[in-house]
Amino acid sequence: MADGTGKMREVLRGLPPFPEELPEFDVQAAPEDPVTLFLTWFNAAVQDKILGPQIMTLATADGAGRVSSRVLICKDVDDTGRWYFASSSDSEKGRDLAANPHAAASFYWPQQGRQIRIRGRAGSAGRRASAEDFLARPPASRAAALIGQQSKPMSELADLDDAFRACEAKIEADPEILAPDWTLYALSAETVEFWQADHQRRHLRLQYLRGDDTWTRRLLWP
């Protein structure tokens, strides 16, 4: 284990990056669109009982180009090549997207040595879709969203407890109450890359690029 005495580099180099067995990826048999391949890989991750296959990392940048990233849940994927996630429009990511809609998302399933990278533009999926997403959330999640204040300084934990109790009471009194800033976002992919690890470092990378009406595919050097 790393002990803070300069051995961190050795510890990191000694950790295995991939499992002994890795799935095959026949790039020649890949479908014409990235959504079909994404669903194939995602379903394989579910069948292999990969923990949290729906979790993705979302990177955004503010108007000055300062980048930040966070882990969140993918809420849906549609046939047009849009990946959905939800958040407060007043959160850091929401403010970033209001100033700069360009965003990137990635899925990583280390037990399979697979990564999927998505780049494009993100925007609101609309008020109705946002309301439906909010009301489908568990009560505790709705209470957290009603509190708001995400990423803002908090004086003490007791403030969080008080805010939760107050918002849980609001939900009990009105089960249809909505958080006005809750937004379902759609990341419309411009490029989607599928990466399959290889023990000999002959990693396979297949990238899809969106055209006017169709997707084109190309291999990338690892």
Model-predicted segments: where are they?
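Binding-site signature for planar aromatic cofactors or substrates
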Residues: M1-P222
